[in-house]
Amino acid sequence: MMIDIRRLAFSALVCIALPITAVSEEQNDSGRLLTADDLLALKSVGGPEISPDREWIAYTIDTIDVEADDSSTQIYMVSRDGKDVVQLTSDDYSANSPKWSPDGRYLGFIAAKGEDDDAKSQVWLLDRRGGDAKQYTSVDQGIRGFDWSPDSKKMLLMITDKSAAELAEEAAEEAGEEAKPLPYVIDRLQFKQDGVPYLDRSRTHIYVWNSDDESLQQLTFGDYEDGQATWRPDGSEIAFTSNRTDEPDSNENSDIWVVSAEGDAPVRDPRRITSNPGSDSSPTWSNDGRRIAYITVTEPELIWYATNHLAIASAAGGDERVLTAALDRNISAPLFTPDDQSILFSLEDSAEQHLGRYDLNTGAIDRPVEGNLSIGRFAQHSSGDVALQISLPHLPTELFYLGSDQLTQITKTNDETLHDLDLAEVRNIAFKSADGTTVEGFIFTPPDYRKGRKYPTILRIHGGPVSQFDFSFNADAQLLAAQGYVVVISNPRGSSGYGQDFSAALFANWGVPDFEDVMAAVDYAIAEGYSDPDRLGVGGWSYGGILTNYVITKTDRFEGAITGASEVNYIANYGHDHYQLQWEKELGLPWEDKEAWEKISPWENIDKVVTPTLVMGGKEDWNVPIQNSEQLYQVLKRRGIETQLVVYPEESHGISRPSFRKDRWDRYVAWYDKHVMGQ
């Protein structure tokens, strides 16, 4: 069974299964233009989880409350045919990670629910026979994740050790004293991570909660981080991912391990399943419990440029085999099919994200869902049916159901927001870079686009660098197109989806082939008659901002630039961001290989910038620290280049507060309108 979205007309989604150029023709030609407020009104769909009786799919909806300047997540369920939708959790608290008990009686989820503002995340249960959610766990520091045992009587919990501050606060409370703040005491090689305080020795371990006697038993120990835990189908063991080398902070050598879930032994020695020196992750058991499929990186020296392959090993350990080496595309989220004859997975390929399937008997790979789309998370029922997330150029993520050779859209979460909007037409393009390399991309044209007219054009660059623009809904590009811009996006070298060599072309070579590729995208848009060469803008976030910095230090063709959460002076990031291991592998140590660090740093050509540049970032960003933006701003301001620095308080690498997200979109439009549109 193979379903290609390019040839299929979905039930419940009329005409959206046509090629991308035809999809655009189905848009509302008399609608209104998209605004930042519309983007905030869009709801994010998460999940799915299929009920054991196959009748319902649980999922989450994240909704923004503009007035409260916050967002919340609720759990819903939708019938398999999409006709009935039921909200399961109330709007007064956020809930996530819904999981059905295997016996079908309960739906578990995680929520920090309670009258106390400091309530910790716990597992709560909804009884399918009715009633309010009831708290199931009570862990002082809260839980990070959970999974039902196959017999529904136990629950695997991921719990992080209490921090020094939490222990001190407890001690003060017991003594009837007020807790005093403690200094951060750091002794780890890797001591930063975006979105969290300084890293200490608190580690996440595996516990099992037994509902019969309400006991909590710890299964894994030590100065190691454990994650991605999953039950063996007979409930006797748990597979998990952990880096248990002598110094986990100095490498990315995570392996698959298995620990017994039976008996009363206080300390258990996990069994090592994989021995690959690279990262092994995402373990999943075969239904007979004899094998474990997982994701492996076989060339760890290439860090994030290496391809993620599908692999399999004996559950007893050994017999490790890489299954998709010849495919040369990134694989994720493996799941055995019910008959154990195949493995499903998510497959990234050339601006598309497909549902792939590997036949364990023949080695053949097919794609049950493919085409001009981007799938997200998926879940499989014991019948073989699959529920999955899909996004399209004019469709933010919704849930679809694949059963009986029929792919059906079962949620329409954002129809009300989208129905009267006139969105940009999106065209898939391919062009040659300066050295003849073929590069793929997309062009978004304004809803009132007229062929023959040359439009002001914005080059938007994706983050990563190892990621890709795909056929999913692109909020930034749609918003700018609604303002009258042609928007050009591309997947330059360094991007994923085109093979390891394409990604690794950027290794220690930032700002060289990728610069040529994005400039070729602009030249293509000009040559095809879309773009006015005298009204060009450029911008991006994260690596998109970094490549923007290369662009403005190498060319004066752009009238305005926006660089968000970017780096500019690389050597200043040593010991400051959370990429210390990756920096060292790619560029060496700065006191030993100073030239390598300086060679690719935009800082070395910062005196050549003449483009008016808006600089943005989050104050608490430890992924790409705000000091980079501050240094860039300082240079531009000192040199008399028109610039502005916008810093969002209490924000890390991604901007989450709704008012800040709207502010960022508004500033994008205002800056480009002034410098590119000429208003």
Identify the function of each model-found stretch.
Residues E67-S72, E115-K120, P197-S202, P248-S254, ...:
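Short, solvent-exposed loop/turn segments at conserved positions within beta-propeller repeat blades
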Residues T245-D246, E299-P300, T413-D534, W541, ...:
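Cap/lid segment of the alpha/beta-hydrolase catalytic domain
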Residues S79-K83, D127-G131, N210-E214, S260-A265, ...:
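Short loop/turn segments that connect beta-strands within beta-propeller blades
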Residues S72-T73, T160-W209, S254, T307-L310, ...:
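Predominantly five- to eight-bladed beta-propeller fold
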Residues L42-A58, D92-I110, A133, S138-M155, ...:
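Conserved beta-propeller blade repeats
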Residues N28-T63, E67-D69:
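Mature N-terminal segment immediately following signal peptide/propeptide cleavage
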Residues I489-Q679:
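Active-site-proximal cap/loop segments of hydrolase catalytic domains
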